[in-house]
Design a protein with these regions (language model features):
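Flexible phosphate-sensing "switch/lid" loops adjacent to ATP/NTP-binding sites
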Residues: 1-140
Length: 140
């Protein structure tokens, strides 16, 4: 990881599980919507003395129920780079099965367009959940 390479990195939790693991952070799903961006910005400001901040995401920009939280964190944290989390073969939004999940290239474009509002930002990686495919297919 980053710390093993001598990089001063900090995980900034935005959900209850992340807070339990890290010991600090803000539970963004409990913040009033008008203040999510400010809470994300405050989380960054409190930890800006580190070289790299890894901001935990909540929800998804393509989930109609939780996209406001995701967008608030995105704009408030003003990232320089993103790592997308993607589940292979998942084509419907959980809990709202009539809503299709776009293909990964389209999700990447959505995130990059919305993250470039304040400063340059790009997707630098994908964390892939491959539980629905074989190990051989996951390595393709």
């Amino acid at each position: 990881g980053l710390k093993e390479r001598g990089i001063d990195a900090k995980f900034c939790a935005t959900g209850q599980t992340g807070i339990m693991l890290e010991g600090s952070g803000y539970p963004m799903d409990r913040v009033i919507a008008d203040f999510i961006s400010g809470a994300a910005e405050q989380l960054v400001l409190e930890n800006e003395h580190h070289d790299v901040l890894l901001i935990e995401w909540q929800g998804s920009l393509v989930h109609p129920s939780y996209s406001a939280v995701t967008l608030g964190i995105l704009h408030g944290s003003a990232p320089h780079a993103l790592v997308l989390c993607y589940e292979v073969l998942r084509d419907k939004v959980t809990g709202v099965e009539h809503v299709a999940i776009p293909a990964l290239p389209q999700i990447r474009r959505i995130f990059e367009v919305l993250s470039n509002v304040h400063q340059p930002c790009e997707v630098i990686g994908v964390s892939m959940n491959s539980r629905r495919v074989s190990e051989a297919d996951a390595h393709v």
